[in-house]
Amino acid sequence: MNRRGILKSVLSAAAAALGVNRLAAPAQAQVAPTKHIRLYVEMDVPAAREREMLQIFHGTFVPEAVKHEGYIRVKMLKRRTILQGTAPAQHNYRFELEFESEELRQKWIASAEHQRVWPQVERAMTTLKDYPVVLYDEV
């Protein structure tokens, strides 16, 4: 068989496979998407400690967090401006963590690894107790 014949056969097979998959998809049971949780921590980090906190976050915390079951993402956000309403002036960073479920997040925070890495981030904050930590469910 020549190259043209092989190419036609491959394309025909691919087209048939795509057609079969499109027809079969509606018959398959639809799986409900997982509803994740998201945790927000409002942080007050003095300007003199920002670089240190960000180095710890990106260099220590993130590489450890990604290893844990249920982890989806973690972000550190620096507040630019308040567009509407009010917010505590000292809260200049927001830590954002997303996990597949609260149960898996609880496993992560109970781990020795979390006990080692979170206090390093936390130490850069001015407020070490009673800072806002808010948990949301995806709906």
Task: Name the predicted role of every residue range.
Residues 36-44, 95:
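Active-site-flanking beta-strand signature of metal-NTP-handling nucleotidyl enzymes
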Residues 5-26:
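N-terminal export signals
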Residues 30-35:
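Cleaved targeting-peptide boundary
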Residues 49-76, 113-122:
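Short amphipathic alpha-helical segments
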Residues 51, 102-110:
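Short amphipathic alpha-helices within nucleic acid-binding modules
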Residues 29, 64-94, 135-136:
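Short, glycine- and small/hydrophobic-rich beta-strand elements in well-ordered beta-sheets
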